[in-house]
Every structure is written in C-alpha cells, then in structure tokens.
Amino acid sequence: GKAVIYEIIGNDPAFVPVNELPYYQAELWVGLETERITKNANSNYSALAMPAPECDYRPDSMQIFRNNTEITHLFFMDNLEVNEAIGALNNNEFFTGFCEIVLKPKDALANNQFSKYTFKLFNKDGSIFETTSDFLKITL
C-alpha cells in the first residue's frame, strides 16, 4: 500500500463534483472555534494526526503547522456522512482514528479560494498508516 496523505484542495475543478465519495467539503478553524484560518496564496499549512491511545468513532487530536511552526489543534463541524467514514476506518485495528476532527456539510460553505492542506494518518505504533484506498480525501 501507499502512505496515506489526505489532501484538502480548495475548489479545484479536477476535484468536482465534491458531492460524491470520497470527497467532502470542510471548513477549517484554529484556536478557538470562532477563529478562522486565513487562507491565501502565500499560506503554507499542513496537519499531522497525532496517535491517541484509544478512540471511538470520533476523530483524534490533530495539530496544524505553518512553515513547520505549530499553531494549534484543528476543529471541524460535524457531518454524519464523514463520521460514518471515519467509523469504517476505525474498524481497521491499526488505525488510530481522530478525536477532534469532524467535517461541516458542504452546502454550508461559501465559494472561497483555499490553500492546500495535507493530512498524514498514523498507526498506533507511530508509523504512517498505509492503504491502497483514497477513501478519505477531503475537498474544501
């Protein structure tokens, strides 16, 4: 399998339509849930999923970095469809899951330009989670 690096790419025509799996729209926030990340052509954000000792079907802590400098955790709004997908991934005993990441329904988002975000998922032993699937690719 390949290393799973889930990319979040904003409004790229190549990723339309986003209403079909495995694509979801999400709104990305940092710090307090009312503090919105400013997205522009000069931003360079990436996020790493931090393994949790135990997790149910809710996402695990993730941290966001800008130019390798940690900012804070990521927050998303809930979306049943995405929670189900995360639950399916959690059925894999080697997947750590997520505990603070949920997605907002795509129809609630404005049509804005976003920068590219990269997520890396890790196994419980700290190694990169691998799969042959692009199952959880997310589109802002």
Predicted features along the sequence, with ranges:
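Non-catalytic macromolecular-recognition regions in eukaryotic signaling proteins
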Residues: 1-140
